[in-house]
Amino acid sequence: MLKTPLYESHIAANAKMVDFSGWSMPINYGSQIQEHNNVREDCGIFDVSHMLAVDIQGSEAEKFLRYLLANDVAKLQENKAQYGCMLNHDAGIVDDLITYKVTDEHFRIVVNAGNRESDVAWFNQNAQNFDVAITPQTDLAIVAVQGPKAVAVIKRVVTKEIAAEIEALLPFSFKFFSKWMVARTGYTGEDGFEVILPATQVKKFWDSLLENGAQPAGLGARDTLRLEAGMHLYGADMDTSTTPLERGLGWSVDLSDEHRDFIGKKAYLAKKAQGVDTKWVGVVLKTKGVLRAGQEIDFDNGEKGYITSGSFSPTLKVAIGLAYVPKQADNPVVNIRGKELEVELVKPKFVKNGKSLI
């Protein structure tokens, strides 16, 4: 099994390790709910070095990414980041990822752990007619520093000059400090940063964060935090069999430049014209119980919906989920252990900056 550069640190902290896409990763360090609440109220740190940073460089880097991605990197200024989907020719989602613009000829993309090899292969397959170099940065580590006190903690572990520059970063902006890249991005619905740095330096950085008030958090808390924030998990909420239209991600497909072609555009436009017969929603269980991926939602007209992600919400203290359901249907219920339990359909975002949105 693959190990991140922080593997020994997790073992020393008595983390419960699990297999995640072939990587030995911490699911929790004792209490998933405590780790979750700490990110909502204070500062938690995550080892996400199983994800991969890939640099796209060359005179046609922007041209290539305008073709490769459904969102339009031409709208990005330097030192800004953009969320988007990479589609196949049928408009199915190959991956969702964040693209960072360093210069006109240098972009960095961070891809999901489970898609590392397939994404890089897709990049290379589609780059053959472009003047670009694709470089997976396998010698880098990634640490997410998340929570309302993330700024305070990170300021304690860097110099005063760097602290001021980090604090000034706006959401979805980033800056390089030598080989370190600090971005004001995250996957929790809280303020925070994702730091991409040389693997040889990550243990010292991790330890200094812990010494200055941060608490480690595992993949369990990462999942409940992103679910509360209404953020998609690739492989659970979407995959190549789904288009952005069916998963509430149409906003991330940029169609404003009608002359731009991108992979999947033709199929996407056809699907858009045809219309989708489902909508992407949040689900809240009205009674005690747990919502899980794969559960059916039944409606009084006989139609069904399906939950793609579900869990107990530590912040809201109820079971929540993300689901696709028929556009017109009433009185939703889920069947849990033979009982029909009422659920409420809400916007697919439950918590932001520690506050309930439902």
Swiss-Prot record:
Its EC number is 2.1.2.10. GO terms for cellular component: cytosol; glycine cleavage complex. It catalyses: N(6)-[(R)-S(8)-aminomethyldihydrolipoyl]-L-lysyl-[protein] + (6S)-5,6,7,8-tetrahydrofolate = N(6)-[(R)-dihydrolipoyl]-L-lysyl-[protein] + (6R)-5,10-methylene-5,6,7,8-tetrahydrofolate + NH4(+). Keywords: Aminotransferase, Transferase. NCBIfam families: gcvT, PRK00389.1. Belongs to the GcvT family. This is Aminomethyltransferase.
